[in-house]
Amino acid sequence: MFRLLSASLVLLFLTINALAQAPATGSDSCAELKTRADRAETRLKDWPQLSRYHDDNTKVNPPAKNEQRVVFMGDSITDGWDAPNMGGFFPGKPYVNRGISGQTTSQMLIRFRPDVIDLKPKVVVILAGTNDLAGNTGPTTLDAIQGNLISMAELARANGIRVVLASLLPVSDYEMRDGKPIVQTVRRSPDKIIALNTWMKNYAATNHLIYLDYFSAMVDGKGFLKDELSNDGLHPNAAGYAVMNPLAEAAIQSSLKHGK
């Protein structure tokens, strides 16, 4: 893991230098290049993005008596859940969104304490792993992803937090309007998605956790994400989140009653 982290930092450093030195072209103004360089520098200084929710976390009060607070830990699929055009993130519920777009399980594990444990929820819903498969922070293995998920689950349980492990969503290849395809199934192998989901289901059963199965409700007859549930073959659209909402709510209630 140290080698992967070091490699990621080196790549980010090289990216910053390249962007800073690159000449402006027709589509890339100096301002655009500076913005991209600033983003890369921020990632270099804060690889797990601990700063993303730092201020928000300080404003979260201790849970009220009998409050059933839930934290959703995840990547862009969680991050985008409360976007204005997605139908709302469980309105009226004491649910906290701590998703960060593009993140892998390694990054989530580092920020698990400030973004989950310190908020003192009753339940955490973990949806993670698709960006690991895509290699967002470097090459990885199923064993490494599983290890990070186990570590998050163990940290939660050690702090009295019930755990819901959510399946990865299926993916599908998507053709943009200009004809350029987004080949999601190459970056995120359907076979590996199924293998990781199978492991999660078994791990949850063995350890008395709740397994939240989004996959079965969102996959088509060919094993891909249903076209009507996504606009890019990866992220849910409003219809996709409409499928996920009741499944998540049912899993949370089951965890509060029966999970550990």
Predicted regions and their residues:
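N-terminal secretory targeting modules
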Residues: 1-71, 78-79, 83, 88, ...
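Conserved beta-strand elements of the Class I
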Residues: 71-73, 96
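Short hydrophobic segments within beta-strands
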Residues: 73-74, 166
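Active-site metal-binding loops of divalent metal-dependent hydrolases
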Residues: 76, 100, 130-131
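Compositionally biased, intrinsically disordered or flexible polar/acidic segments
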Residues: 77-78, 239
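Short substrate-entry loop that stabilizes the transition state in hydrolases
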Residues: 80, 104-105
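Alpha-helical cap/lid subdomain in secreted, periplasmic
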Residues: 87-94, 109-260
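A short beta-strand-loop structural module common to alpha/beta enzyme folds
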Residues: 93-104
